[in-house]
Amino acid sequence: MLIKTVFAGFGGQGVLSMGLNLAQAAMIEGKHVTFMPSYGVEVRGGTANCTVAISTEDIASPVASSPEFLVVMSQPSLARFQNQVESGGVLFYNSSLVTADIPRGDIELLAVPATRMAEEMDSPRSANMVMLGAFIKKTNLVSMDTIFETLKETFKTKTKLIAVNKKALMAGYDLALPKRQGDASVRTSSG
């Protein structure tokens, strides 16, 4: 099994944090992992993306020309990466900020109102964790318990942020629970 995921958005949206937390969780679970970040000219407000490859075997190349999963937090990121998603793959998008009008009928779209949900929790900077929670539920690449372990390490000097981010992760995870066709949060690109 080799699964590649691209996370993309503006600098400051926590895109690299999503990828790094996923990569760390996969390593804790004993999987082979590569994490390849890419920054724009300016960090906050510029573009940022990263590729995470997870496998049960050695990984020959971290480059993901056709990732199975794409997670986008901004409209420019959707425009840049949408055509790279492998046929049969899943495109997760922050429907609070992104309009996904994609003519492809060969991928599944998962709309996650991450920014709106984070704002409703009075934690607008945790939109990335809302998205990561939905991603983990849908893909089952790592367990939520392992992601919670990575949060403890990530925020060991800012312990009050652990509970905030855990709440955001669970909100995204719970949003993605129903996977029926026609559900408000899940649809295919052909429907």
Predicted regions: what they are:
Residues 1-191:
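Active-site cofactor/cluster-binding pocket
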